Each structure stands twice: as C-alpha cells, then as structure tokens.
UniProtKB/Swiss-Prot annotation:
This is L-amino-acid oxidase. Expressed by the venom gland. It comes from Vipera berus berus. It comes from the Eukaryota. FAD binds at residues 74, 81-86.
Length: 88
C-alpha cells in the first residue's frame, strides 16, 4: 500500500517555491498583464483545495496538466497546446 501523504508530496515539487512566492506577493505590475494558470496533479488536489480561497481570482487551476506555472499564451508540450489567453 502507498502510504505517502499527498499533501506532503506537494511540497516536494520543483516549482513549489516559485508558486508560493507568486501566491503570496502577486505578479510584478506590467503594462501588459497576463493571466496565470496553475495546473495541479490529481495527487495535489488536497493542497490545491486548501489554497483556493487564498488565490487571486485571475489564477486558474487545470487538474490534468503537468505541475508548472503557465502564462496566458504560453505554449505547452502537453495535449492542451497553447494556454488560452482569453481566460477571465
């Protein structure tokens, strides 16, 4: 049986510190703001749910994509291709 705690596994992700920094401080102001897509793996659903109320409304979650912070219009190598830049 797999006894790994999904919440603990979330903290081992390579991009965790980068995401946490953006979640706490927001993005730097620019003249051309972008939406953020925060994809999560199914094993991270518990952690994602714990952050839901703390995330800015411009952050979106896609459960089937590779863990990474994507910006609107950025190309991804997964089946979804380009991230929709019209996400509101």
């Amino acid at each position: 049986a797999d006894d790994k705690n999904p919440l603990e596994e979330c903290f081992r992700e390579d991009d965790y510190e980068e995401f946490l920094e953006i979640a706490k401080n927001g993005l730097k102001k620019t003249s051309n703001p972008k939406h953020i897509v925060y994809p999560v793996k199914p094993s991270e659903q518990l952690y994602e749910e714990s952050l839901r109320d703390q995330l800015p409304t411009s952050m979106h979650r896609y459960p089937s994509m590779i863990q990474k912070i994507f910006f609107a219009g950025e190309y991804t190598a997964n089946a979804h291709g380009w991230i929709d830049s019209t996400i509101k």
